[in-house]
């Protein structure tokens, strides 16, 4: 039985603790309509309120905590003892295992409260996008928990790479479409330009928003926006308590970054509590937003339906290559994380997928867990930091977020295995 007392009672909001004020969302100067006002039409009211709050702690509704218990919160904090032995490092390595949830990733942590707030409003149908499929799976399950219908626009390349993700979303009751689709004006425009377009998170996001608007449904946000990172803070809040129970003080905290929700949810409570000496955000070298992106106002979605936010971005029209870590195929970085990177509070790394594949294999062989390709990016940075501790003869405590398992990503693993090991 899960002890509900171990589940956090509050979400943590980093905005009051940022080193400087967060540049606010804004409408484009030549806008025909207000994108900020548009949010009122597509987001559940409480989700919108939380998006703009400056409160440090937000009480988690008891109904949401009940659902958190059902999905297995708190998730385990585990020590990677065999990985330590394999690397012959003096460092201790711990990981928070979000793959222990029914949907296999951290995404359910915000899907549940967003679906709850929609249901409380009397909404009957929710819409979203998904890249690798973890977010869509989480929304389909969360919607079913509150008797809501759901529609999910899945990036085409992932839709084709991961048919089992589509299956599980449909088993949970969701309707899944490969984006770009002919269901929206924006999708039809993209398909007219390129009938074989692989899709992107930005495009799928635009389709989901347009679809929600046209049908008076509500849109659920999967990453990037502040409210998502707020809900994901349960990861870091739990991890702090679990490390305290072990008497451990973390030196280095690491997570992968697509839009930033799992990294922010994991590290922000540590940053706010001034725990840890180094925070490392890890991205894909094939989507080089950390190394070549600009810090400027840009649209989170490709069609430009959402308000402009200041973030590190490759540009809303950037089409990411079809790498095996589909959840990292996004052009931008959450505004709060972008600010922390620009202020040099958070460091970044970018790795090629061949390096990630080798790191994932080491983790599988030592710890027995198949990591999601996205999460394997964090593992590569962990290995590098552990070997650095070995070289410098330092007994560091490294903690990372294993944001999901890869048991539904085996097709992607097989694809890269054929390329790398041919």
From Swiss-Prot:
The modification N6-(pyridoxal phosphate)lysine is found at residue 107. Coiled coil: none annotated. This is Tryptophan synthase beta chain 1. It comes from the Archaea. Pathway: Amino-acid biosynthesis; L-tryptophan biosynthesis; L-tryptophan from chorismate: step 5/5. GO terms for cellular component: cytoplasm. The beta subunit is responsible for the synthesis of L-tryptophan from indole and L-serine. It catalyses: (1S,2R)-1-C-(indol-3-yl)glycerol 3-phosphate + L-serine = D-glyceraldehyde 3-phosphate + L-tryptophan + H2O. Its EC number is 4.2.1.20. Belongs to the TrpB family. SUPFAM superfamilies: Tryptophan synthase beta subunit-like PLP-dependent enzymes (SSF53686). Keywords: Amino-acid biosynthesis, Aromatic amino acid biosynthesis, Lyase, Pyridoxal phosphate, Tryptophan biosynthesis. Gene3D superfamilies: 3.40.50.1100. GO terms for molecular function: L-serine hydro-lyase (adding indole, L-tryptophan-forming) activity; pyridoxal phosphate binding; tryptophan synthase activity. Tetramer of two alpha and two beta chains. Pfam families: PALP. Its cofactor is pyridoxal 5'-phosphate. It comes from Sulfurisphaera tokodaii (strain DSM 16993 / JCM 10545 / NBRC 100140 / 7).
């Amino acid at each position: 039985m899960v002890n509900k007392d171990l589940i956090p009672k509050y979400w943590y909001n980093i905005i009051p603790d940022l080193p400087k004020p967060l540049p606010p969302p804004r409408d484009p100067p030549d806008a025909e309509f207000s994108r900020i006002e548009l949010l009122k039409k597509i987001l559940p009211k409480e989700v919108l309120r939380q998006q703009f709050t400056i409160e440090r702690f937000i009480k988690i509704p008891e109904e949401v905590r009940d659902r958190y218990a059902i999905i297995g919160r708190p998730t385990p904090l585990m020590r990677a003892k065999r990985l330590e032995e394999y690397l012959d490092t003096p460092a201790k390595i711990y990981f928070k295992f979000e793959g222990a949830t029914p949907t296999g990733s951290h995404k359910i942590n915000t899907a549940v409260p967003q679906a709850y707030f929609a249901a409380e409003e009397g909404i009957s149908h929710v819409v979203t996008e998904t890249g690798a499929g973890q977010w869509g799976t989480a929304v389909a399950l969360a919607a079913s928990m509150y008797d809501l219908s759901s529609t999910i626009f899945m990036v085409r390349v992932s839709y084709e790479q991961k048919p089992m993700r589509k299956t599980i979303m449909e088993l949970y009751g969701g309707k899944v479409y490969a984006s770009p689709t002919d269901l929206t004006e924006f999708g039809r425009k993209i398909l007219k330009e390129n009938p074989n377009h692989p899709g992107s998170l930005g495009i799928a996001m635009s389709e989901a928003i347009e679809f929600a608007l046209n049908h008076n449904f509500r849109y659920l946000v999967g990453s990037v926006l502040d409210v998502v990172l707020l809900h994901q803070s349960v990861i870091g809040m739990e991890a702090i308590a679990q490390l305290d129970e072990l008497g451990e003080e973390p030196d280095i905290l690491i997570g992968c970054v697509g839009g930033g929700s799992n990294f922010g949810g994991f590290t922000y409570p540590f940053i706010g509590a001034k725990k840890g000496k180094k925070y490392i955000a890890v991205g894909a070298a094939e989507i080089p937003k950390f190394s070549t992106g600009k810090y400027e106002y840009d649209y989170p979605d490709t069609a430009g339906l959402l308000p402009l936010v200041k973030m590190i971005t490759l540009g809303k029209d950037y089409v990411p290559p079809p790498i095996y870590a589909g959840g990292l195929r996004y052009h931008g970085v959450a505004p709060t994380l972008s600010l922390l990177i620009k202020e040099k509070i958070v460091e970044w790394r970018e790795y090629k997928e061949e390096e990630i594949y080798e790191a994932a294999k080491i983790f599988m062989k030592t710890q027995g867990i198949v990591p999601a390709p996205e999460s394997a990016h964090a593992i590569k940075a962990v290995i590098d930091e552990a070997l650095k501790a070995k070289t410098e003869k330092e007994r560091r405590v490294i903690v990372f977020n294993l944001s999901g398992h890869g048991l539904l990503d085996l097709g992607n693993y097989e694809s890269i295995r054929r390329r790398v090991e041919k």
